[in-house]
């Protein structure tokens, strides 16, 4: 079953800008929270996880990208790049998750 956000997160009003992602429970450092963006060819798809995280110069999350390919299957060949959101600090229940915006510097 598709879930736009992990069970540990909720979207709420943010003091930073509009709405943001907040922890519903304590989240440990180095936790993979899921996919924020996928790049297929020249198209970039942003997930709800990527759409609601706000910028901070002192973030508690980072993103990591992976290149995914399936050139071994002669019937369906694909490749894409995906970005996942990881916590870099322990995050307390109620704390907003933030990221240093560098996505468009790619």
Task: Go through the PLM ranges and name each one.
Residues 1-106:
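Conserved catalytic SET/PR domain of SAM-dependent protein methyltransferases, capturing the structural core
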